């Protein structure tokens, strides 16, 4: 197994102190952006309104393996807002966990959105969209209010302007910054 990457160490002012590879190469944050994306859920009041637990917030902030306990957390998040997995637009997937995948295959179950490693993040975005009274079918759209809020948060956390963000759409239908 081979991995490729770059290392950049910078001080608080952004001065490069050490690097391995090109320190100015554009890199998409992908799942590393999930904690920043979850800030929108926290700021929306959805945590309090729907009684979201720390465990449920944690699955919104990270990728998961699609194991039964993780899938149950995502189902609970959705259920607290009166939603179900049909609202998720993260794409269908088998679990990353080989054991969970084998069990689904043994039972003849197809891949589904709950087992997608990003379903927790998507559940959080749905809660944010719902509490703001937004169209739940549009939450992953780049120009949706949910995504605009997230972009503002990322700019604030990273100390950059919107014009400095780069966007792409991946196989999960959601933009990554």
Functional labels for PLM-detected ranges:
Residues 29-47:
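Active-site SXXK
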């Amino acid at each position: 197994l081979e991995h490729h990457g770059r290392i950049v160490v910078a001080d608080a002012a952004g001065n490069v102190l050490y690097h391995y590879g090109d320190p100015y190469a554009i890199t998409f944050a992908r799942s590393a952006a999930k904690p920043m994306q979850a800030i929108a859920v926290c700021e929306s009041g959805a945590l309090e309104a729907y009684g979201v637990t720390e465990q449920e917030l944690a699955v919104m902030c990270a990728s998961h393996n699609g194991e039964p306990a993780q899938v149950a957390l995502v189902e609970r998040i959705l259920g607290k807002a009166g939603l179900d997995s049909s609202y998720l637009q993260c794409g269908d997937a088998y679990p990353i966990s080989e054991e969970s995948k084998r069990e689904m295959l043994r039972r003849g179950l197809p891949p589904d959105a709950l087992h997608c490693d990003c379903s927790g993040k998507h559940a959080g975005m749905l809660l944010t969209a719902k509490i703001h009274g937004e169209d739940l079918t549009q939450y992953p759209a780049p120009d949706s209010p949910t995504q605009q809020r997230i972009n503002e948060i990322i700019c604030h956390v990273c100390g950059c302007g919107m014009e400095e963000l780069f966007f792409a759409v991946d196989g999960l239908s959601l933009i990554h910054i």
